[in-house]
């Protein structure tokens, strides 16, 4: 298995699909990486030479992926909560952020129902 950005990439999959195993790289970005490195999208990882895998590593290193991306996202959420803005308050209360209704729905975000005490 090839190791890119600290992740073991599946050998038997096509390059585009295998790159999506990295957190922060979706299908579109994987296609852009393949185009930039001039590697065929339908080539399997096990068919690539070591030099081609090195170019993939260099291209992926240009993007924020994996742990750095996770850390950046959590820091952005923490910043919103510290600011006390509307989105930060909604994060703090575990409610939907983007204007969805909460009277009847939003069970995933709010968690299981709590019984009403008498």
Swiss-Prot record:
<feature type="region of interest" description="Disordered">
    <location>
        <begin position="94"/>
        <end position="118"/>
    </location>
</feature>
<dbReference type="GO" id="GO:0000049">
    <property type="term" value="F:tRNA binding"/>
</dbReference>
<keyword id="KW-0689">Ribosomal protein</keyword>
<keyword id="KW-0694">RNA-binding</keyword>
<keyword id="KW-0687">Ribonucleoprotein</keyword>
<dbReference type="GO" id="GO:0019843">
    <property type="term" value="F:rRNA binding"/>
</dbReference>
<keyword id="KW-0820">tRNA-binding</keyword>
<keyword id="KW-0699">rRNA-binding</keyword>
<dbReference type="GO" id="GO:0005829">
    <property type="term" value="C:cytosol"/>
</dbReference>
<dbReference type="GO" id="GO:0006412">
    <property type="term" value="P:translation"/>
</dbReference>
<comment type="function">
    <text>Located at the top of the head of the 30S subunit, it contacts several helices of the 16S rRNA. In the 70S ribosome it contacts the 23S rRNA (bridge B1a) and protein L5 of the 50S subunit (bridge B1b), connecting the 2 subunits; these bridges are implicated in subunit movement. Contacts the tRNAs in the A and P-sites.</text>
</comment>
<comment type="subunit">
    <text>Part of the 30S ribosomal subunit. Forms a loose heterodimer with protein S19. Forms two bridges to the 50S subunit in the 70S ribosome.</text>
</comment>
<dbReference type="InterPro" id="IPR019980">
    <property type="entry name" value="Ribosomal_uS13_bac-type"/>
</dbReference>
<dbReference type="InterPro" id="IPR001892">
    <property type="entry name" value="Ribosomal_uS13"/>
</dbReference>
<dbReference type="GO" id="GO:0003735">
    <property type="term" value="F:structural constituent of ribosome"/>
</dbReference>
<protein>
    <recommendedName>
        <fullName>Small ribosomal subunit protein uS13</fullName>
    </recommendedName>
</protein>
<dbReference type="InterPro" id="IPR010979">
    <property type="entry name" value="Ribosomal_uS13-like_H2TH"/>
</dbReference>
<dbReference type="InterPro" id="IPR018269">
    <property type="entry name" value="Ribosomal_uS13_CS"/>
</dbReference>
<dbReference type="InterPro" id="IPR027437">
    <property type="entry name" value="Rbsml_uS13_C"/>
</dbReference>
<dbReference type="Pfam" id="PF00416">
    <property type="entry name" value="Ribosomal_S13"/>
</dbReference>
<comment type="similarity">
    <text>Belongs to the universal ribosomal protein uS13 family.</text>
</comment>
<dbReference type="GO" id="GO:0015935">
    <property type="term" value="C:small ribosomal subunit"/>
</dbReference>
């Amino acid at each position: 298995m090839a190791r890119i950005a600290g992740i073991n990439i599946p050998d038997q999959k096509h390059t585009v699909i295998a790159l999506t195993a990295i957190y922060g790289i979706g299908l579109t970005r994987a296609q852009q990486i393949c185009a930039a490195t001039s590697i065929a999208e339908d080539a399997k990882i096990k068919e690539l030479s070591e030099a081609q895998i090195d170019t993939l590593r260099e291209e992926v290193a240009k993007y924020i992926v994996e742990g750095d991306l996770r850390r950046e996202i959590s820091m952005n959420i923490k910043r919103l909560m510290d600011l006390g803005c509307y989105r930060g308050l909604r994060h703090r209360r575990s409610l939907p952020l983007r204007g969805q209704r909460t009277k009847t729905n939003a069970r995933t975000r709010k968690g299981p129902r709590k019984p009403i005490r008498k």
